[in-house]
Amino acid sequence: FDCTTKDLGDITIPDIMRVEDGSGFVRYLTNEELGVHNDKPVILMIDEYGKANPAVKNALLRLLLERKIGSYTLHPDSIVFATTNLGAEGVGDLLPAHARNRLTVIESSKPTWEQWIEWGINNGIDPTVLGWCRNNDKAFADFRDVEDPDENDYVYHPRSTRAAFVTPRSLEAASDWMKVRDKVNDN
C-alpha cells in the first residue's frame, strides 16, 4: 500500500447509516485495496509511511497500533508493518513524535557487496552486473560512512546534488536491461 499516492479518501470513506427511529450514525468503509473487508488474514505492507500526508499517517497509525481501520478490525492472524527511509537521509520521511514513540522501529542496513552478489547469483542477476558489483564494492557503502559526498559517486548522500545513485533496486533493473539488450533496436 503505497502511502505517497494516497489521501484520506483512499483509506476510508464515510457511509451514513440510518436506523428505524430516524437517527443515524457513520460507519467507515475501507478501501478494498487493503483487503481487510474480507475477514481473512492479510499481510499488509504500508510503504513510504513517513512520506504520507498527516491525515493518512494518523489513519494508518490506528491500523498499526489497534489493528483497526475505519469500522473494520483486522483478522487476528493478519500481519501489518510499515516502511520508510531514515529521516537523516533528507528525503522527506518523518515520523511524528507520537507515532515514533508507539512504534517499534527496526533499521535495516544495505547489503554488503558480498551479500548482494550471493543474492544475485541465486536470483538470476546478469553476470555482467555481478562483475560490476565485485569491482565497485564502494557502491554498497552507507552514506553515513561517507563524510564527503564527492568521495563516493555511487551512493546517495543527502548533501550531494547528484540525482542518480546505485541501489540494489537499480542494480536489479540494470540486470533486467542487460538480459534484453540484444532485443532492443538501436534505431
Please tell me what each predicted stretch does.
Residues 120-187:
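Conserved AAA+ ATPase small/helical "lid" subdomain
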Residues 1-135:
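AAA+ P-loop NTPase catalytic core and its hallmark functional loops
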